[in-house]
Regions:
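Sec-dependent signal peptide recognition
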Residues: 1-8
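N-terminal regions of proteins, emphasizing targeting and processing segments when present
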Residues: 8-11, 32
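N-terminal signal peptide c-region/cleavage motif recognized by signal peptidases
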Residues: 13-15
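Serine-dependent protease modules
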Residues: 18-298
Length: 298
């Protein structure tokens, strides 16, 4: 009898644990179609360096050396003017994005489409469209692109301010080109500032993000986009549990300016501010290390 009771309690605990885990299937089915794969092609011209040969007379003692070791007819050989023909090749890259309006406007990261000569957007129904960049902002890593299509499925937007640390979130994207891949995790922190990014209060998560996920959406459990997956912190180049997303309200403010005025307008207060450390507080005779110090006036 006791064994039966133990087994029953064990099965009950398993059932309770399973019920406590989130189910993402409905979210993916409803909103996954608004996530796209982005591929770019960039034409790169690489100039070949020619040997730097001084202009020497035939009676110069080094003339024979350069004549022998630089092939005849090659630019740079005595008597052969000109430079080598530049070498051209294509650079291809992959990223993710998502549709924000039914008439073909999409958001992605600026670094996904930077310097691209051709941008191709692939929908989940396998249709492909050429896209053009409406505008981009390197400081926030946001780009607004457009495809010529209508009746598209668009995402719903949420409020990142309402996110709580520990809340479940989900990412959809194309890591390493594997389209419509779904990963999930929790919000690890809010308002993170990275050394190279002074304009973005990042959402930190432990959602698995890899190359190709950049520009894809971060969903809350209500199926609303709360961020754009942008970068990871890693010592190896691979995912190590530290992912960072741009809050969607920041992204929408940027895209609104790009769409309406074509550029980003930012205010400046003309001062450089730094955090008051314990050492600074002691040197100024402060009771606690709090507040901010105006370090310089521009």
């Amino acid at each position: 009898m006791s064994r039966i009771l133990v087994v029953a309690l064990f099965l009950f605990s398993l059932g309770a644990s399973a019920q406590g885990l989130p189910d993402f299937t409905e979210l993916v089915e409803k909103h996954g179609a608004a996530v796209v794969n982005i591929s770019t092609t960039t034409q790169i011209t690489q100039r070949r360096g020619a040997p730097q040969v001084p202009q020497l007379d035939e009676d110069d003692p080094f003339y024979e050396f350069f004549r022998r070791f630089i092939p005849r007819g090659q630019p740079g050989q005595p008597g052969q003017p000109g430079q080598p023909a530049p070498r051209q090749f294509e650079s291809r890259s992959l990223g993710s994005g998502f549709i924000i309006s039914a008439d073909g406007y999409l958001l992605t990261n600026a670094h996904v489409v930077e310097a691209a000569d051709e941008i191709t957007v692939k929908l989940t129904d396998k249709r492909e469209f050429k896209a053009k960049v409406i505008g981009s902002d390197k400081r926030t890593d946001i780009a607004l692109i457009k495809i010529e299509a209508t009746g598209l499925p668009a995402v719903r937007l949420g409020d990142p301010a309402k996110l709580k640390v520990g809340e479940w979130v989900l990412a959809i994207g194309s890591p390493f080109g594997f389209e419509s891949s779904v990963t999930a995790g929790i919000v690890s922190a809010k308002g993170r500032t990275l050394p190279s990014e002074n304009f973005v209060p990042f959402l930190q998560t432990d959602v698995a993000i890899n190359p190709g996920n950049s520009g894809g959406p971060l969903f809350n459990m209500r199926g609303e986009v709360v961020g754009i997956n942008s970068q990871i912190y890693s010592r190896t180049g691979g995912f190590m549990g530290l992912s960072f997303a741009i809050p969607i309200d920041v992204a929408m403010d940027i895209q609104n300016q790009l769409r309406t005025i074509g550029k980003i307008s930012r205010g400046r207060i003309g001062v450089v501010i730094q955090e008051v450390s314990k050492e600074l507080a002691e040197s100024f005779g402060l009771k606690s290390a709090s507040g901010a110090l105006v370090n310089a006036v521009e």
